[in-house]
Every structure is written in C-alpha cells, then in structure tokens.
Design a protein with these regions (language model features):
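Alpha-helix N-cap and coil->helix boundary residues
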Residues: 3, 24-25, 43
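A short, conserved structural fragment
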Residues: 52-62
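Short acidic, hydrophobic short linear motifs in intrinsically disordered regions
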Residues: 19-34
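Short amphipathic alpha-helical interaction segments
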Residues: 38-50
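Short alpha-helical segments that sit at the start of domains
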Residues: 1-20
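Short, cationic-aromatic polyanion-contact patches
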Residues: 5, 62-70
Length: 70
C-alpha cells in the first residue's frame, strides 16, 4: 500500500500547491487514483481514512470529504 499512499500524497500535494488556502475534495482524489491505477474506490478511501487517523492528512469534515496535508 506504500504506492497508494504515495499517490494520495502526490495528488493532495498538487492541489495544496495550487490552492494553499483550500482543502482538497477527497472524492476527486479517490476518483482520479482509482481511474488511473489499479486500486478500487474503497481501497483509496480506506487509505485516506488511515492517513487522517495517523495525522498525515488533516480533514476539515468528519467524513474526510475535504483533506489537506499537514
């Protein structure tokens, strides 16, 4: 799952660089990764949830709809 985590970080980092004062919509990240790589929507969603709990990502809402790198 290290590859998946890196893809999530890359996608969120690109968004945060372009829009530093906004949170990234996690469904956009999930859809982009699951469309371009061999990960299911659920796998990406679960990994984002883990990364929020680990403190790697910050979530604005309790359902992890909007995420940001810490």
């Amino acid at each position: 799952m290290e590859r998946l985590r890196n893809l999530i970080l890359e996608n969120v980092a690109m968004f945060n660089e372009a829009f530093p004062n906004r949170f990234c919509h996690s469904p956009d990240v999930i859809s982009a990764i699951s469309h371009d790589y061999k990960f299911t929507y659920g796998q990406v969603e679960n990994e984002i949830e883990k990364m929020v709990h680990e403190g790697v990502l910050d979530a604005e809402l309790s359902d992890w709809y909007e995420i940001k790198l810490l």
